Amino acid sequence: MKYCFYYDESEHSRFIKLSTVTGETYYDGFLAAIIGWRSDHETAFEQRYHTFEEKYADRKKKGELKSGTIKPKQLVHGFASLNKANVKLLGDFFSIFDENSYIYLFCASKIEYVITQLFKGYRNSVFFDMDAARYSIVKAIVTYQPTEVIESLYKSPAEFVAALKTFLTSRIRLNTENLELKAQENTAFESVLCVLNNVDVPQSLDWDYHSQFVGFGNFLSSKGVLDYSVLLDKEGEAGVESKTLIAAKDTGLKNCDEADSIDHFGIRMADMLVGIIGKLMKSLYHSLTPTQDSPRIAKTLLSKEWFRLTDEQLQLYKQLYHIVFEINNDWYKVYAGNYSDDLVSFLGLLDFMNHFNSAKDIEQDFDMQPEYCNSCIFQRLKNHFEQMKNKLPVEPVKDQKKDFFRNRRGAKVYYDVDRQPTLELTKGKNAFVVQSVGIAKGGIPLVTIEASPENLCYRLPVQLWEWAITLVSLANAGEDLFPAEVIFTKAENRIYADII
């Protein structure tokens, strides 16, 4: 069965430069949405969206109804800021999505892209988590917007490290005024200071368009979608492939093309969805970020205005929750970089609002709702940071019709671990080139051995469980020791393993 997908993006800066990140309208997040359905459902979705557009025909601009019809100031306190007409419009739009919809969302930090380029020579190790360090640097710059650091980054990247060191040292000193709230931040900043010794000047600060399509490719694989087309909103010069389209093709997506949104309702739907989510996330960011003249060590909560909701406004949160969390849910449905606090906060807000049945439920303990919501968001951020510590890749199993799948080294791994052959060892030393070590369900250790014509996966003797779990833990901390030659020694009732 063929599937039709449509792509659009929001909060995109074509070039990243000093004026980009210091402008009044700047927002660090870049968002993309890809929506789609089976081709036999295309007509039904098209009819629904055309009915929606005609109902609000007076809102069209240049013949199109897109997310620009909702202005940022109309979401300054989230859906609580919307008037009745806009509540009705968004409710009608969200209702177009049903269980036949496939929705993929991507979010990235513009500053994270710059920092990743500057520190591209650094790698995770068992001794230092570079992902966490990059996260801390990005969060510090996005949250505090230190002018001297940002200016040094663009005027003279060679001066960036010195400026960042000065800024972090200053923040550590200021944070000591309230270690109850800032102890964790200080620990992170102190760790970052330990590695700020060398930095490579980036080759380019142009935006990298690949990440959103890498995640979408994983989403398609996880869903088992093989026959599809992807249509992107056309940007740039006519007759010339955009960087976005080139990136989509580079990542292996097939049947990709771009077109004018006025000719394709699916692109307009993607624009509406990603635009509304982008504006909502932007308002959430500004509401949770301290202003320049506010005390930096104070806890920042959403104002009570976010929670003065009517039943209709609350229903919008519940509808959007259904779209983001429930319709054709998947591990890769929402894809982001390491620094994705705004996205995580947005998901936390949806989760929090969804548990209310009516606006009266919110009113029962109204004054405490900002605190309760903050706790919900904080827990999500904490879980995200814990997941970030896990360095082992998560990959979709592409073919679930067979009784086995192929691991990253191309070896057969049976779903029923009892069918996995055991590595046969003779008395004395047995040498193998080991590609990887893992743990199957039930705690059974596995090893992938280099072989011809294909690598082979075996069960290891139970005596090597502790050895295997240690290596998995090291890999999870960023220290992968394989491939490498391993000597398995069988002596009496014991088996030993030595990495050469």
Question: What residue spans do the PLM features occupy?
Answer:
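Short linear interaction motifs
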Residues: 83-88, 211, 463-468
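Generic detector of solvent-exposed, compositionally biased contiguous segments
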Residues: 1-19, 189-192, 349-362, 416-435
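Charge-dense, low-complexity intrinsically disordered regions
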Residues: 97-398
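Short, charge-rich binding segments
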Residues: 82-85, 92-99, 475-480, 489
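Short, contiguous, well-structured surface segments enriched in hydrophobic/aromatic residues
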Residues: 51-66, 431-467
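Short nucleic-acid-contacting surface segments enriched for D/E, G, S/T with interspersed K/R
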Residues: 426-427, 467-487
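OB-fold ssDNA-binding interfaces and closely related basic DNA-contact patches used
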Residues: 394-453, 492-500
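An N-terminal structural lobe/cap that precedes and organizes the functional/catalytic core
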Residues: 1-82, 90-97, 102
